[in-house]
């Protein structure tokens, strides 16, 4: 009886191995499902990007507004009679040389006022 139980247990393990660790086992199925989800996410991002680019292409083909906007912002073009004004924030002043130390006999150097 003990031999039959041991034989059945070994047979059960032999059957379970391909199910869990084999070529088409659960671990491989889980990995493939994970890859499919990642690819679906990438595909969705690319679809959104393609839709945006398609809209830009249609704008450039159909209307002059998009062309004018690109010419203004990317190339700095202006219409006749317009004046281009650009406000630039001033850069912080940077001293080229460090300040000189006070002379040795001055009140600032001795600590007396």
From Swiss-Prot:
Superkingdom of source: Bacteria
Region (Disordered): 93-113
Keyword Phosphoprotein: no
Localization of this protein: Cell inner membrane
Protein's UniProt keywords contain Coiled coil: yes
Residues annotated as transmembrane: 4-21
Periplasmic side: 22-113
InterPro entries documented for this protein: Cell_div_FtsB (IPR023081), FtsL/DivIC (IPR007060)
Primary subcellular site in the record, as a coarse category: membrane
Topological category with respect to the lipid bilayer: Single-pass type II membrane protein
GO biological process, one term: FtsZ-dependent cytokinesis
Key words of the record: Cell cycle, Cell division, Cell inner membrane, Cell membrane, Coiled coil, Membrane, Transmembrane, Transmembrane helix
One GO CC annotation: cell division site
Record Pfam families: DivIC
Cytoplasmic side stretches: 1-3
Complex formation: Part of a complex composed of FtsB, FtsL and FtsQ.
Job description of the protein: Essential cell division protein. May link together the upstream cell division proteins, which are predominantly cytoplasmic, with the downstream cell division proteins, which are predominantly periplasmic.
Family as reported in the entry's similarity comment: Belongs to the FtsB family.
Protein name: Cell division protein FtsB
Lineage of producing organism: Bacteria, Pseudomonadati, Pseudomonadota, Betaproteobacteria, Burkholderiales
Gene designation: ftsB
């Amino acid at each position: 009886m003990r031999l039959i139980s041991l034989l059945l247990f070994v047979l059960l393990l032999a059957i379970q191995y391909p199910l869990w660790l084999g070529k088409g086992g659960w671990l491989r199925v889980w990995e493939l499902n994970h890859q499919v989800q990642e690819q679906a996410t990438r595909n969705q991002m690319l679809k959104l990007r393609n839709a945006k680019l398609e809209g830009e292409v249609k704008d450039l083909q159909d209307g002059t507004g998009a062309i004018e906007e690109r010419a203004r912002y990317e190339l700095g073009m202006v219409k006749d009679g317009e004046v281009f004004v650009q406000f630039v924030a001033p850069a912080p002043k940077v001293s080229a040389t460090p300040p000189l130390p006070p002379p040795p006999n001055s009140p600032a150097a001795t600590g007396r006022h």
